[in-house]
Design a protein with these regions (language model features):
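Acidic, surface-exposed loops and disordered segments
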Residues: 1-191
Length: 191
């Protein structure tokens, strides 16, 4: 699989195959990839909590919100939650803000997952209570959660209609509008 194929395979997945479990070792391999990525001023302020056990997975699921634009449905569907999570935290003793590092780490984790035949979803809508429920020390601030598992939904990329970038569902398909290249290049596209 070339890099473009890997990027295209990496979609925000909100329904997972319940038959495919994920191991701590698989999660560690993904975090190890993130560990090797660049970090601003090489501070490396990110710390990770791994969840692969059903009880912790259920706790995380109950304290996150998914697909905020889809008001009429609850995701993930009952029985199709992720097999595991990687909770990305910032160690505030090292840095107060590490948004760029978090983005680089999350994308690296998701690309590594795609290479393994897994899918994922970055979750930023997190109940603040989750910090204490997970037993995290005060110095760790949850920045983003990456849900992981084998995807069980039909996700299709389409071009935007006008300026509408809102994702939507039709039947069992999840549509993700993407702006055309010419629209995002400030200095014009190739002629």
């Amino acid at each position: 699989m070339n890099f473009r194929e890997l990027v295209l395979k990496n979609r925000s997945t909100r329904a997972f195959d319940p038959e495919r479990r994920i191991s701590r070792e698989e999660l560690e391999q993904l975090v190890d990839l993130a560990r090797l990525t660049p970090s601003a001023v090489n501070l490396q302020p990110l710390k990770y909590l791994l969840s692969w056990q059903e009880e912790t997975n259920a706790l995380i699921l109950a304290h996150t919100a998914w697909a905020g634009l889809l008001k009429d449905i609850s995701l993930p569907p009952e029985g199709k939650g992720p097999a595991g999570y990687i909770v990305i935290c910032i160690d505030t003793r090292i840095a107060k803000n590490a948004a760029t590092d978090v983005g680089i780490a999350a994308q690296t984790i998701l690309l590594g997952a795609a290479e393994k035949g897994l899918s994922g979803c970055m979750i930023g809508a997190i109940d603040p209570k989750l910090h204490d429920l997970l037993g995290l020390k005060e110095q760790y601030r949850i920045s983003l959660i990456v849900a992981l598992g084998r995807g069980a939904e039909d996700i299709r990329l389409v071009e935007t209609r006008g300026n509408d970038t809102a994702y939507y569902r039709e039947g069992d398909a999840h549509y993700v509008p993407k702006r055309p290249l010419e629209e995002i290049l400030i200095n014009g596209g190739a002629k």
